Amino acid sequence: MWFAAAPALGSGAAVVFGPPCGAVESEMDEQTLLKKLRWRCRRGMRELDQLFGRYLDQRWAQAPDAERAVFLQLLDCEDDKLWRWFMGYEACPDAANAALIADIRALPA
């Protein structure tokens, strides 16, 4: 929330104050990050879009930094590899990625 004060006498310009505390800024930063991640999760394959979106909706906010880093690694992977890993056609060679893939697959729809 932004606050504006009445214009100073004779100046004609209003004084604008920023957010009242740093918490609002960090919330905005988290919201901006979430929007960017949601865009990166758009893979062009409905199934992958739904799986990644489900993770963002259900787990991202509470996820520890290490898990978030693994999720960001997954977003850098090629779609065809992700598809094979998520559908179980191929084993993911990275143990951390494989564990997160299993967790994402287990999330309720």
UniProtKB/Swiss-Prot annotation:
Any one Gene Ontology cellular component term annotated for this protein: cytoplasm
UniProt keyword list: Chaperone, Cytoplasm
Pfam families given in the database record: Sdh5
Annotated localization: Cytoplasm
Primary residence: cytoplasm
Gene Ontology biological process terms, A to Z: succinate metabolic process
PANTHER family according to UniProt: FAD ASSEMBLY FACTOR SDHE (PTHR39585:SF1)
Protein family (similarity comment): Belongs to the SdhE FAD assembly factor family.
Function: An FAD assembly protein, which accelerates covalent attachment of the cofactor into other proteins. Plays an essential role in the assembly of succinate dehydrogenase (SDH, respiratory complex II), an enzyme complex that is a component of both the tricarboxylic acid cycle and the electron transport chain, and which couples the oxidation of succinate to fumarate with the reduction of ubiquinone (coenzyme Q) to ubiquinol. Required for flavinylation (covalent attachment of FAD) of the flavoprotein subunit SdhA of SDH and other flavinylated proteins as well.
Name of the molecule in the record: FAD assembly factor SdhE
